[in-house]
């Protein structure tokens, strides 16, 4: 609706940007480097970050970088994940029909992973997104999941990704056996003010607009509200563009952004 008004070639601030068009901050680049190292060393790793900070986007980038002849990426995201469902999902992604009973499915998955590594020369990369929602039962199962050949061999990398509370959960004594196995930890921070300004400029440019549409004052209000969280920035920018187009305004100032935030986002 606002695209023709501003002259956009496509809608800006979308989540489904091609990997080649994604904006990256130094924090994102560090995360990608750490994830690649995790995969190379077959680590068990923990990635945390606030909602909308770009964790899942980083996983998309990682997936696009890995050679499919060397790695098999297995992505799991289920708020009600149980061990049986987990094994079933991983096995299906490995083109195996999962056994009905949990113990059988677990042994089946172990065999499938070893076959992938030893016979096909590919390393499994298991990505568990929204891991802060994992149940106690599922978290405890991870310890057994990582136990290959009496804990002397690790044929895969396992990456847990979730909100900051995941780190706090794993600090509980009952999960000490799990935390001792974590080979890499990283917390993805939000963008700072300059990074957010560059982020907005990047998304406008990718959508076909080279000129700035948001005043400095508008960006200051936006940063104050969003804290540099990409998803919040996207939402407010889209709503502000729509509001500006409806009012026949070519420039988005601090007054409009503040009004949009107050009326649409309740702050």
Regions found by a protein language model. Name each.
Residues 45-48, 75, 127:
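Short hydrophobic/aromatic beta-strand immediately N-terminal to the Walker A/P-loop
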Residues 60, 155, 177, 194-267:
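C-terminal alpha-helical "lid" subdomain
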Residues 1-41, 258:
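A short, basic N-terminal segment
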Residues 82-85, 97-141, 150-154, 191-196, ...:
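Mid-core helix/loop region of P-loop NTP-binding domains shared across ATPases and GTPases
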Residues 11-13, 70-73, 81-100:
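Conserved NTP-binding/hydrolysis module of P-loop NTPases
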Residues 41-64:
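Walker A/P-loop nucleotide-binding motif
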Residues 76-79, 170, 183-196:
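Conserved AAA+ ATPase "SRH/arginine-finger" region at the nucleotide-binding site
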Residues 63-66, 166-181:
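Short regulatory helix/loop adjacent to the ATP-binding pocket of P-loop NTPases
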């Amino acid at each position: 609706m606002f695209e023709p008004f501003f002259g956009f070639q496509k809608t800006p601030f979308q989540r489904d940007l091609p990997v080649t068009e994604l904006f990256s901050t130094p924090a994102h680049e560090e995360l990608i480097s750490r994830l690649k190292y995790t995969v190379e060393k077959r680590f068990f790793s923990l990635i945390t970050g606030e909602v909308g900070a770009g964790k899942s986007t980083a996983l998309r980038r990682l997936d696009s970088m890995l050679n499919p002849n060397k790695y098999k990426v297995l992505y799991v995201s289920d708020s009600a994940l149980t061990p049986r469902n987990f094994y079933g999902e991983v096995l299906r992604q490995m083109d195996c029909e999962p056994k009905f009973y949990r113990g059988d499915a677990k042994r089946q998955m172990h065999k499938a992973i070893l076959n992938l590594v030893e016979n096909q020369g590919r390393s499994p990369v298991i990505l568990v997104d929204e891991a802060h929602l994992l149940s106690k039962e599922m978290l405890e199962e991870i310890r057994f999941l990582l136990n290959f050949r009496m804990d002397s061999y690790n044929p895969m990398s396992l990456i847990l990704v979730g909100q900051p509370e995941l780190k706090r959960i794993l600090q509980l004594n009952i999960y000490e056996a799990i935390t001792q196995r974590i080979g890499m930890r990283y917390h993805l921070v939000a963008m700072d003010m300059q990074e957010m300004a560059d982020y907005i400029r990047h998304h406008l440019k990718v959508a076909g607009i080279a000129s700035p549409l948001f005043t400095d004052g508008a960006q200051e209000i936006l940063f104050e509200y969003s804290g540099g969280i990409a998803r919040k920035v996207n939402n407010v920018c889209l709503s502000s563009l729509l509001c500006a187009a409806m009012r026949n305004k070519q420039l988005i100032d601090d007054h409009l952004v503040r009004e949009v935030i107050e009326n649409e986002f309740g702050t």
